[in-house]
Amino acid sequence: NIGVVQTRWSHINRDYSILTQIQAFALDAHFTLEQVGRNSKNHFMNFNGTAGIWRKTCIIDSGNWQGDTLTEDLDLSYRAQLKKWKFKYLEDVETPSELPIVISAIRSQQFRWNKGGAENFQKMSKNVIHAKNLPLITKVHSILHLLNSTMFLNVFFVGVLSIPMLYIKNEWGHLSLYYDLSSLFIVSTLIFFGCYWVLYRYSKGGGFLNFLEFTKIFFTFYTVAMGFSFHNALAVLEGHIGKKSDFIRTPKFNVLTIKKSLKYNKYTRKKVSKNTIFEGLL
């Protein structure tokens, strides 16, 4: 009773810039780790908005397409799976996609994805918890999946508090035991690093040089994620409190190399917001 077939995104402009490289880096992990894992264990997964096909009867049976969240594909995915429709993920089938290449487009896409995730937690979490004949482990996994974007609240506060914590540690040295215990949280970063390395090695191969290249892109990705944490945290907060906003589409430029100019492209924004400056400082 398959309702959806989802394929893996490939990226036609992966090597356009460092921004497209780290986006591809993160999305590759989503598809090859998260989607493969969820589907293989029969946990709830999400349709990715494109690169797949829906059965019409599945859409209708699940309550049709609804526009009350910014990630309506995630919303419909959960409603369909609560109706016992099956999803099929094809890791070996690549569908070419284009990554956003300018900051304004990346920010609007990230805002939509992260706010939509929070909106869907508010909309779907109770339905998941109270669903009959749904294994407890699947319920737990689904709730954590819906809370995925909420991690940016934690990332933002950790980043902002890191500087005053250095002062506090210096002034209240008698609390050194607590500071030492807090360093255990680095284990989560090491796990994160290890998971991404396994995936990178799977696609690019092992070896010392590949490991060096991976380390460079991983910490670049980590740094940019920290910079985006303020913007994404605002999106998550809006999603949880129910503040509505317009669906802003991600512009496509059909630009595959840095040599092609964007000077006259109507989607290129020249103004830089104050939030963007703050993100750069982060």
Predicted segments — roles?
Residues 131-154, 254-282:
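Loop-to-transmembrane boundary segments
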Residues 145-252, 274-282:
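Membrane-embedded multi-pass helical conduit in multi-pass membrane proteins
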Residues 70-75, 220:
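Conserved glycosyltransferase catalytic-site signature
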Residues 42, 68, 77-96:
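Catalytic donor-sugar/metal-binding loop of nucleotide-sugar-dependent glycosyltransferases
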Residues 2-70, 82, 103-136, 140-143, ...:
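Long helical/loop segments within the catalytic core of UDP-sugar-dependent glycosyltransferases
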Residues 24, 28, 86, 95, ...:
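Short, well-ordered loop/turn and helix-capping segments at boundaries between secondary-structure elements
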Residues 98-115, 210-213, 244-262:
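Nucleotide-sugar-dependent glycosyltransferase catalytic core
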Residues 85-102, 124-135, 159-169, 220-230, ...:
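Hydrophobic alpha-helical transmembrane segments
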